[in-house]
Amino acid sequence: MQNNEVLKPAKYFSELEKSVLLALVEKYKYVLECKKSDARTIALKQRTWQALAHEYNSQPSVSLRDFKQLKKCWENIKARTKKIMAHERREKGKLFGPESNSHQALKEKVASMLPEQLYFVQNQPEEERGYNHDTSNQEMDCKRVNLLDLEVLIDEQGKIQTKPFRKVPETNLLCDDGSPPQSIDKAFSNGDLELLIDEQGKIQAEPIRKVPVTDSQCIQGSPSSSLKTESFVVPERDVYEDQNSIANMHSSESSVHSTPIFPSSKLSANRTYGRKPSQNGIFTKMHEEQHHQQMSILQLQLIQMNEVHVAKVQQIERECEMAEEEHRIKMEILNKKKMYWERKLQTITKEWPVASFNRPFPNSP
């Protein structure tokens, strides 16, 4: 009848206990969340949960739990979190539907076609700009990207085509001391466009307008003099090598020309204005994760080796105790035998004294 007794339910995990459990799971996550299912990994997970339970129970202000309860609690937390994340993804898909996906696909397609032909232009502060944008341009935080060698043509049907960029002699305006001015406009052919991509993913284009550079744009302290007009070339792959040789692309000052309307928009850049994280950062993160994984495995190995050594020491101590007990029992047996033979010898000497053995035999001559 003892098996039919009603067991009391365990206490619910408090927020403090859940935080302690999550911290310990984060510590051993590379072992507990391993996707392997071989016998060695399963045994390692079992020992890891036992070690985690030992550390959990050693924390203050927590109830004593076994590793099965901790494992079940972690599985419930994980399942609940996955359910919430799936619900958020569904809600996000309802809000941002196929329109944003089409813009994303278009920008990714253009980026895959021309990955190495773009360089980035720094946005000038508002006080340095010589003209005011339209109302729509003031509301958008746009980043400008200019193409060097190729142009991308996107017609009304959405087809993408490329053609070589027609280069025009460029002007290099230098001060008397040989240093370039603070802002230089790179000359492009008439009808060249700049791509405006706002944060919402909308793509717009406007023509590049040029303005002559005056003496006031030279470096501070340089005397005002006539500027020499020469060819100034910005190589494709050396744009980022020397910052002193980079010309900052910027919009011109007030202009009377209005923006023309084209049947097919000429785009000279794509969504790659937001540069992806550098490969070095990705490799560093991977190395850090591998390092944490190796450290967790080494820590588990040290714990296992410590447990093995403790078990060996306990076994040796038990063997020593057993040997001592066996030796004590043997000594007791030997002492009993010694006492037995001593008592027997005493009885023999009493019955047959030693002096009687020295008497001559009666029949001796």
From Swiss-Prot:
Pfam families: Myb_DNA-bind_5 (PF13873)
Domain Myb-like span(s) in chain numbering: 13-78
Keyword field: Coiled coil
InterPro entries: Myb_DNA-bind_5 (IPR028002)
Coiled coil: 301-337
Protein family according to the UniProt entry: Belongs to the MSANTD3 family.
UniProt-recorded name of the protein: Myb/SANT-like DNA-binding domain-containing protein 3
Organism: Xenopus laevis
